[in-house]
């Protein structure tokens, strides 16, 4: 396997957005008719898959796109206050310097991501940002990107913090690195059998290097 492109999720993988997202979704709970998340419930929710969370919340699947839109707008007001995951900038810089092409695929807005990257001096590390994907539609965007760039499944790897990131990667047969520092717990991620499960950003360097070594 010769990895050429590493695609990253944004929320929870690159940016520490968990607390902000909980506050925002709690604020919108009454409007969209779902239960708020109490602080003591967060650990249990992190053990659920994305689909289980949607089901448990009781929100109508038809309201999800409208909720996502409002969450993005609300997050825009907080984006300047958010921080990168500790150690992620160093890992990204190393991966970029090794000749990898880095990109972002997110259900957040491109504007939010761009503002965040500029604020933290990360914008030059990424070649592309694809935004606006549905909660469970990332695999379609990745497949289209691969086709447009003549990439095969062995040349692309996805990095994400949620069970749905693993599901999307498996649907199109690309390898996935699950990271336990974001939304879903390591136990929830492990149940979905990612190709790699890591717990610190520096481990990204080791995983990608090991894959390149297999080829050489």
Annotate each predicted stretch with a short phrase.
Residues 1, 98-100, 149-155, 211, ...:
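Glycine-rich phosphate-binding loop signature in dinucleotide/nucleotide-binding domains
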Residues 3-89:
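N-terminal helical cap/lid subdomain that shapes the substrate entry/recognition surface
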Residues 5, 139-166:
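Conserved Lys-Pro-Asp/Glu-containing loop-to-beta segment of HAD-superfamily phosphomonoesterases
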Residues 35, 60, 122-127, 152, ...:
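Conserved H-loop
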Residues 41-42, 123-136:
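A short, structured active-site edge motif that brings together acidic residues
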Residues 157-197:
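Acidic, Mg2+-coordinating phosphoryl-transfer loop and its flanking beta/alpha structural elements
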